[in-house]
């Protein structure tokens, strides 16, 4: 294992531990995952999310939204997360229930040269105060058919923002 991979892995593990300790003070951790993702791991996590969230006795609408956002988040991390020289990714995912809401917390490494573009994209999405304006932005983005080098059209964050109504 390369020194860089060790440092990336250690960095993600350190951030995960800090965040997990912090969020435990504010709610009940329903699901947690740290490490690599694959379609098989995502399938297991999807089942866990479905089981945990349906057990909360929430209305069907919020359950569907939580499930959708969880799956979209996991897929985004798998597809777009930075891969080290050995092809490994460092990710984490936490599903937390507080008294007032469900939080989906995720993290993955991003290549340094992608940080500015990603920050800009998130800033634009978060700048919308109106659902209709965000939906118009989504449709405009969809019609432009701009694909990334990883095959995405940049719609994941937008759909998450639209579904959650809480950026």
Task: Specify the residue positions occupied by each region the protein language model found.
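Short, contiguous, helix-prone interaction/anchoring segments in small proteins
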Residues: 34-42
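Conserved beta-strand-loop-beta-strand hairpin that lines the nucleotide-binding pocket
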Residues: 2-10, 20-32, 44, 80-167
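Active-site Tyr-X1-5-Lys
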Residues: 11-15
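Conserved short strand/loop->alpha-helix "switch" segment adjacent to the catalytic nucleotide/phosphoryl-transfer site
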Residues: 47-71, 143-150
């Amino acid at each position: 294992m390369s020194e860089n991979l060790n440092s990336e892995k250690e960095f993600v593990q350190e951030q995960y531990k800090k965040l997990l300790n912090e969020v435990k003070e504010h709610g009940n951790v329903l699901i947690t995952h740290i490490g690599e993702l694959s379609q098989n791991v995502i399938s297991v996590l999807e089942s866990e999310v479905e089981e945990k969230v349906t057990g909360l006795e929430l209305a069907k609408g919020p359950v569907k939204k939580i499930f959708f956002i969880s799956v979209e988040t996991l897929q985004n991390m798998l597809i777009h997360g930075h891969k080290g020289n050995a092809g490994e990714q460092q990710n984490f995912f936490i599903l937390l229930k507080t008294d007032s809401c469900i939080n989906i917390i995720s993290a993955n490494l991003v290549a340094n040269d992608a940080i500015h573009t990603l920050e800009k994209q998130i800033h634009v999405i978060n700048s919308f105060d109106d659902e209709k304006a965000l939906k118009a932005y989504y449709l405009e983005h969809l019609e432009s058919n701009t694909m990334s080098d990883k095959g995405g059209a940049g719609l994941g964050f937008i759909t998450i923002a639209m579904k959650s109504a809480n950026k």
